[in-house]
Amino acid sequence: MGNSDSQYTLQGSKNHSNTITGAKQIPCSLKIRGIHAKEEKSLHGWGHGSNGAGYKSRSLARSCLSHFKSNQPYASRLGGPTCKVSRGVAYSTHRTNAPGKDFQGISAAFSTENGFHSVGHELADNHITSRDCNGHLLNCYGRNESIASTPPGEDRKSPRVLIKTLGKLDGCLRVEFHNGGNPSKVPAEDCSEPVQLLRYSPTLASETSPVPEARRGSSADSLPSHRPSPTDSRLRSSKGSSLSSESSWYDSPWGNAGELSEAEGSFLAPGMPDPSLHASFPPGDAKKPFNQSSSLSSLRELYKDANLGSLSPSGIRLSDEYMGTHASLSNRVSFASDIDVPSRVAHGDPIQYSSFTLPCRKPKAFVEDTAKKDSLKARMRRISDWTGSLSRKKRKLQEPRSKEGSDYFDSRSDGLNTDVQGSSQASAFLWSGGSTQILSQRSESTHAIGSDPLRQNIYENFMRELEMSRTNTENIETSTETAESSSESLSSLEQLDLLFEKEQGVVRKAGWLFFKPLVTVQKERKLELVARRKWKQYWVTLKGCTLLFYETYGKNSMDQSSAPRCALFAEDSIVQSVPEHPKKENVFCLSNSFGDVYLFQATSQTDLENWVTAVHSACASLFAKKHGKEDTLRLLKNQTKNLLQKIDMDSKMKKMAELQLSVVSDPKNRKAIENQIQQWEQNLEKFHMDLFRMRCYLASLQGGELPNPKSLLAAASRPSKLALGRLGILSVSSFHALVCSRDDSALRKRTLSLTQRGRNKKGIFSSLKGLDTLARKGKEKRPSITQVDELLHIYGSTVDGVPRDNAWEIQTYVHFQDNHGVTVGIKPEHRVEDILTLACKMRQLEPSHYGLQLRKLVDDNVEYCIPAPYEYMQQQVYDEIEVFPLNVYDVQLTKTGSVCDFGFAVTAQVDERQHLSRIFISDVLPDGLAYGEGLRKGNEIMTLNGEAVSDLDLKQMEALFSEKSVGLTLIARPPDTKATLCTSWSDSDLFSRDQKSLLPPPNQSQLLEEFLDNFKKNTANDFSNVPDITTGLKRSQTDGTLDQVSHREKMEQTFRSAEQITALCRSFNDSQANGMEGPRENQDPPPRSLARHLSDADRLRKVIQELVDTEKSYVKDLSCLFELYLEPLQNETFLTQDEMESLFGSLPEMLEFQKVFLETLEDGISASSDFNTLETPSQFRKLLFSLGGSFLYYADHFKLYSGFCANHIKVQKVLERAKTDKAFKAFLDARNPTKQHSSTLESYLIKPVQRVLKYPLLLKELVSLTDQESEEHYHLTEALKAMEKVASHINEMQKIYEDYGTVFDQLVAEQSGTEKEVTELSMGELLMHSTVSWLNPFLSLGKARKDLELTVFVFKRAVILVYKENCKLKKKLPSNSRPAHNSTDLDPFKFRWLIPISALQVRLGNPAGTENNSIWELIHTKSEIEGRPETIFQLCCSDSESKTNIVKVIRSILRENFRRHIKCELPLEKTCKDRLVPLKNRVPVSAKLASSRSLKVLKNSSSNEWTGETGKGTLLDSDEGSLSSGTQSSGCPTAEGRQDSKSTSPGKYPHPGLADFADNLIKESDILSDEDDDHRQTVKQGSPTKDIEIQFQRLRISEDPDVHPEAEQQPGPESGEGQKGGEQPKLVRGHFCPIKRKANSTKRDRGTLLKAQIRHQSLDSQSENATIDLNSVLEREFSVQSLTSVVSEECFYETESHGKS
């Protein structure tokens, strides 16, 4: 009927019933919905009978994108609902049957009497054949017949069509067929009969004659002159749709007279019979038409002979059964090939017609309304072309698996089949004897699929929707010979394979494009950026609305040598140019209705614009087809107008709701209103998005500018902006994806795409489909499509007459290990265990003896994972499904003398007679006998002591388990975790069960157990297929050991298949190489570093060895960093000195320190000669003390890393320069020619950050493996605390830098003078920070002066004072942009001040009349050169202790600066560059186990004595790991092994030259004391500190390099008891040790100090033949000019016994 706007399109109803003599005539009523007053109607819907009622396949899979792969019949139940269906198209071209003419006739249904044009066609003398059944013809005969079989006199009148409206408001009508020759004979009573409402049920009441439909076989007397002219409205192109139409009218093969119809076989050749319906015989000849003695039992037999054309009409009959069932209204449908139908024309009586009705929503009769008849008929006469029709050899591509009828768009079926030899080929015929529905059929011939005439009619989409919406009442019987809707029977990838093999749609655009996914929809409809994917180049063709990606170039789709790599469905897409892309030009972004966003890069700007136009035009064409419109432009304009109205309405409603919300106080009502407002916001966003999309489509069709996206983005609601802000992309494309992610229909499509991917690769998006034929490894193992079809023939038939619901079903091939397999249909409700059971039953196997695993191809590796039995199969991601036999193995458990139980528990499943059916291992003790023999949780016991489990009852089982020895036969159940079993193993069997000589060695057996333990554990979920379990639980505990290695080896021999054992060995090798670099997170129970069956000694040994090995690797990496990058960069000019500082900073010191630390660790291990043979943890005691002592000794030194870590932000900035600086980039490329990421500068610079945070993890491992009551456990715990404090200190430094780094950089940049004294402030040089009150604030601060608090930062080079306004509303400066600018309102730092150390003084200041001991003064000295007056800051700490700490720290840097000026006048930066941090010491004495003193210190020291407290000024030299005098003493010296002349460490101890300073510095010498608690003592007359001060003044500084000490020295004041009187104590370096002395350790009396002075004088007067200048050593190593200055350092001397211990 050609209603281009109607929701149903009639292509011509078919006669589906047999002629029965004397049948009562029932008028045919066709009820057609959706006819509106202003809609234009097209004749195209009235197809001629050859294939007028062809159904589309229920093609939800392979052929779903091509409408006409196969047409199958449908017969439905009564009273079903009507579903909206897209318009079907058929072209009504008619023939005459005048004597002497070659035309068979023209349907009177389309005669000029009824207002229709008729078109005659002159055909050549050849057979136009059809090899594709349209599925809607009831002339079930498959032979060609000569034209002579129909005498000229047998022509008859065509039926007359009467159109009657059914209901005034319904818009529906009824079409009644009557004898076309006598319109006046239409019985009046027929018009009043109730309309029979069926779902396309060709009904035949008893004694009813079928109706001859508008078929090519219907004879008529119409003349060829009735053909329309080429300018007929039927042949016009649609108005205004030239851009969106895929081909105009002159492309179509149904053009002027003399051309063939686009659908081959639409017209019969002169030598062909009239394939009129067999129901069309006059009553007079009713006894002959079907030769009722039919011998055929089903129509399938008609197609078994390829030469059916030779049969006589009398030899072809419908079975009596068929006729009977039709007579009883059993709703059968059958069909035959279009052309293999003999004419059944007879003379005489008028033809009677049956009544047909279309489905409607209200199954009741409607009162006729004839008022609209004329207007409807007039509308039906209007014939116009359809926008987007395809050329004759093309076929439209349709989105697959769309579930809504309205989503299926239609296009004309084109393509002429000129294969003359194909006339005898018939489609694989589907016949059902008692079905209400027939599944789709498809041609066996591949060529037939591609080029057969394919039609559709108004029922197609309706029936498809019925298929999808049906829930029960499915009682179809399907022939085993059918392919059973092969379009659904293949996996999704195979569907796409076939689809793109057969697809011949119009290519709108093709070209090279770079492609990269950007955004996709993850779980819970959340948009996420795609994991970093590289740009890839493809040859992209736009076919219809699908982008096909090829890896090679072809001139057109027919020339493509390979199948497309993937396909991207671009339905309802928006394409936007991305000029702001930072790296590439000509980039555009495509977002589709699935919520996916993709980036493309075109070759030029013109190419980009062409792609945008092409995609938008294709989407517009598809949009028009889905809405059944022929005028795309008008449709889009109407849609735009409607959307504007909707936006206006919803905006008003939303405003009203907001007003209402402002006055409503009830919480429930407010919640409801808020939800409604949110819904309106989302609706508005969707409307705005659709409006923008329509305008984009209009712009592409009209050649205009694309709309401005500002108005669209302005419509985004606050939640949407927040979501896009989290995503990091605010653009039209991301907004479109967000809106689409909320759409339920798009989500359903996406879910279908995701769940029906079958063996798709992981990571391919729902709308981006990969194809099976590409990059498929092991393709020879995959069944071909034809093999899958054959399997479907075998296994695809439904059981018990109930069909599968193929709409959501995936046909998947399941592999078995014998290289065979089966195809099973996976439904959404199928779990893993269901698929396993189904596959095993198809192979007659016992499912309980098999497991299911998924094979995935990741890069070049094959990964296996075993899903849990209860998980849904369609939710898995895999390439192949494999069923593998579970491993059966025997275990003999025997209790020895000390073992009282086996160490496992069982769960039994029993029947009602208390007989066992199954026994499972429910628990296994990790260190029990059963575990050692290979029993694992979840294994199933098959036999007990040779007795089958099924033959036992509970009592017998308990009796057997109570015996001393029990023999078990077990099945190893697969794990329920989806952990990857292995990667990239070979298929060769390295270990075979019958090759005992190839068993892995015992240590590999243990390692295999470790891995098997990880993935052989099961939870109760494994037994989800055991619903009712009565438990006979036997739980026991044991302390047995693994002493039966032979049994274990036997178990390993049979425990895993060869492939898995190979993989496990390889996996272990990988894990060994990786070591402990990452904590294991996937293990359950909680992670431990090694498997439980290893002894504690083995685990300790492994962790210690790993600590040393990784330390070696780390030191090697740092060395490579210096050799590859640091040293060569110093000779280059493209990095400034500041940038070099940022990049490398304290790395030289760090490297030297790490070398020393590594040597310390190695010394500790080498001291334990039996390290590899220790058997118990207690034997590791000495070694663990050594390791713990090393960490304690160097804990503060690790704070070197704080500066480096804080500077890592700068590192990123410097490395960014490589993108713009070609010279820098060339340098980096030259350093890393192999392009390995591990060798890049960025990779090397991150290693220190990773390493320093790794130490606490390793120490935690050691702590967990020691006895909690042991001394080494306490010792390691203290070391762990120390390293955790280091980590927290590093984090604190980073936080300070983030908060105040802006200020530090600004102050450095704002320094006055030609040469800046402070070029950089590194966080590694931050010694202390504290908050103080400012007692004399500047007047310029105004109101802020009251109670003003400053933060004091003490660096090695300067002191900084900062006042930060505590206002949360003010934003601080971003740390990544730090320009020098004046203080503004946005700047929270209202005051900042930098005092270089050269202009710094500090003094204690108590204002007169105050008793506050917490006040002190910081002085910025005046400078005449810079014209700077003296500035005094009066500061007050919170308590005297805080004051003491900060003043100590400032004094220490002043001493450091003084020494530097005295020695060489070198600036600090130069000395820092030349200084290498630690002396290469041997093992610290504190780490020596036998030292009674160190043990005593360890036992008596509290935890906070191991490391200095950060906030109290104890981190004086964090850049060098040392602590200056007065903050941290050196409690643990090291035995001096050898001196390294390069190792210097200035600035550690009090400078004796301080005595020469002004009195105001000396008088406060209590501050300089080494006592940590000296700050508690005030300056009093006669105090011990005063005595020390006097002695300092008397000390002489020895600068004579020729004075050498003798070997015989006086013992130091702290010499040990066992030291000989004349023996020189060993000089050790102890200033790194964080273990503090006791508070009274340096409170000397006057006699002690005098003795020290005498001893110092004796040192200076030693003979000159000594080889060591002790003073020079002290000066070089400890930055002190005389030994006298360190007489109070008790730990500098120790007994020889300590050194040897």
Curated annotation (Swiss-Prot):
Organism: Homo sapiens
Protein name: Rho guanine nucleotide exchange factor TIAM2
Single GO MF descriptor: GTPase activator activity
Key words, A-Z: Cell projection, Coiled coil, Cytoplasm, Guanine-nucleotide releasing factor, Lipoprotein, Myristate, Phosphoprotein, Repeat
Occurrences of domain RBD (ranges): 810-881
This protein's encoding gene: TIAM2
Modification Phosphoserine, positions: 1583
PANTHER family: RHO GUANINE NUCLEOTIDE EXCHANGE FACTOR TIAM2 (PTHR46001:SF5), TIAM (MAMMALIAN TUMOR INVASION AND METASTASIS FACTOR) HOMOLOG (PTHR46001)
Ranges annotated as biased composition (Basic and acidic residues): 397-413, 1596-1607
Ranges annotated as biased composition (Low complexity): 238-248, 1513-1527
Classification via InterPro entries: DBL_dom_sf, DH_dom, GDS_CDC24_CS, PDZ, PDZ_sf, PH-like_dom_sf, PH_domain, PH_Tiam1/2
